[in-house]
UniProtKB/Swiss-Prot annotation:
It comes from Mycobacterium avium (strain 104). This is Nucleotide-binding protein MAV_4575. CDD domains: YajQ_like. GO terms for cellular component: cytosol. Belongs to the YajQ family. GO terms for molecular function: nucleotide binding. Coiled coil: none annotated.
């Protein structure tokens, strides 16, 4: 019998983030408490999002609105890293970044966790920014997925290519 396997990745669907950004921009444009504050939210490059407003508390509230929209679109908060508000002339800015891929440090933590606490006979391989987990039994793979969902890791994980 062939080995069963799955891949652990950390990727964000850019289209879903774009939808959340557009929903947040629409809400910021129409909400009463944001009137006259020149609050904007926009892409800044491929992985960065910039929020600007006239006051520090309004830019923090704009970040909260954006995070709420991300949650509604099933995007983990671990995938979005919002910076601190920075004064820039008469406005305040917050630069946020999307975290994609599993760093080698986090990959080592995850493989060590699987080796130490996972079922016996489960093998892991680090392949760039993803991890391949294989085993003879599919039940062991499902146990690994359940264990990783319960673990408190600082990376948003998705499980793909389950075969």
């Amino acid at each position: 019998m062939a080995d069963s396997s799955f891949d652990i990745v950390s990727k964000v669907d850019r289209q879903e983030v774009d939808n959340a950004l557009n929903q947040a921009a629409k809400e910021l444009a129409t909400r009463f408490d944001f009137r006259g504050t020149d609050t904007t939210i926009a892409w800044k490059g491929d992985e960065a999002i910039e929020l600007t407003s006239s006051t520090e508390e309004r830019v923090k509230a704009a970040v909260d609105v954006f995070k709420e929209k991300l949650i509604r679109r099933d995007i983990s908060m671990k995938a979005f890293d919002a910076g601190e508000p920075q004064a820039s002339g008469k406005t305040y800015k917050v630069n946020g970044t999307l975290k994609q891929g599993i760093s080698s440090e986090n990959a080592k933590k995850i493989t060590k966790l699987i080796r130490d606490e996972g079922p016996k006979g489960v093998k892991t391989q680090i392949q760039g920014d993803e991890i391949r987990v294989s085993s003879k039994k599919r039940d062991d793979l499902q146990a690994v997925i359940a264990m990783l969902k319960q673990a408190d890791l600082d990376v948003a994980l998705q499980f793909v290519n389950y075969r």
